[in-house]
Amino acid sequence: MTVLKNDRFLRALMRQPVDQTPVWMMRQAGRYLPEYRATRAQAGDFMGLCTNPERACEVTLQPLERYPLDAAILFSDILTIPDAMGLGLYFETGEGPKFKKTISTAADIEKLEVIKPLQDLPYVMDAVSTIRRELNGRVPLIGFSGSPWTLATYMVEGGSSKDFQKTKALIYNHPEAAAQLMDKLADSVIAYLNAQIDAGAQAVQIFDSWGGALSHDAYKTFSLAPMAKIVKGLKRENEGRKVPVILFTKGGGQWLEAMADAGADCLGLDWTTDIGQARARVGDKVALQGNMDPSILYASPDRIREEVARILASYGAGTGHVFNLGHGITPGVDPEHAGAFIRAVGELSAQYHK
């Protein structure tokens, strides 16, 4: 077992004392970095990066060379599971992910098989083990998956969607078939994340990008319940350490109390929820991750620092906070502004941990 030189991130997730608030950024390996764009050009396209463990490792580590981050996150895509189910993932420039096949009937769902990660997605596990080796204990590595609901939206719509009309029609017209789809996806996510943990992931995050589009009750049935099932099925210890789990529903602020009962160690917050109020609502059940608006990175470094100070003050003293953006960093951000954000967290947060 490699000794972790910096375990601040894992300690905060488990609400253990830390010397300062740990920080990382969703999509920290991404198009805002010129070195990422250069590696992606060499790979040919996005999937060429994802499916090559050495290149995936290279881009995973790039932000750590620039910034004093407290965690690395596996470079991959949330849609690897539907791709492994045979739907044929591809990317069109400027249009995002698309699938050659879609799911539209109960018969389509019946035919889907739960994935076998080592057989279907070996390149992901190879990337995890390669990154762990190269990190050599520098910081922990986060593995991840999309949530069943979020994966289902892409599988049914065939790509991105503004209103999820087809997926919502499925859950309302054919709730039993929709439940079967969520079950198969939950079982696939359990297998996928456990394989990542076996390969060396030291924490895992479930990205529920589109849960916030659901009604109050539909969220609990078709998004939260499958995620709770996943949390229950995950390996919670590896290499003698607990493997913490983060749940992140974009637009999920109204469900924090229910999410806190799902068994995860930490809840991710987007920027529409006040983190101080969120802390009061969940108490000491879970840690919180977030939640600066990524668009603030387009402001001046001084304004970025002010916003970091405001969020730290809102959360208040003590552990249980992982600083992050409220969603992924966007491609037009100046890398210097991202650096100002990371440095501000380090410089301003120690006073809250005395």
UniProtKB/Swiss-Prot annotation:
Parts forming coiled coils: none
GO terms for MF: uroporphyrinogen decarboxylase activity
Residues the record marks as site: Transition state stabilizer: D77
Catalytic activity: uroporphyrinogen III + 4 H(+) = coproporphyrinogen III + 4 CO2
Keywords, sorted A to Z: Cytoplasm, Decarboxylase, Lyase, Porphyrin biosynthesis
Protein localization: Cytoplasm
One of the GO biological process terms: protoporphyrinogen IX biosynthetic process from glutamate
Positions that bind substrate: R27, Q28, A29, G30, R31, D77, Y154, S209, H327
EC number, as in UniProt: 4.1.1.37
Class of this enzyme: lyase
Recorded superkingdom: Bacteria
NCBIfam families hit by this protein: hemE
Protein's job: Catalyzes the decarboxylation of four acetate groups of uroporphyrinogen-III to yield coproporphyrinogen-III.
Homology family: Belongs to the uroporphyrinogen decarboxylase family.
Record text on subunit structure and interactions: Homodimer.
Protein name: Uroporphyrinogen decarboxylase
Lineage: Bacteria, Pseudomonadati, Pseudomonadota, Gammaproteobacteria, Cellvibrionales
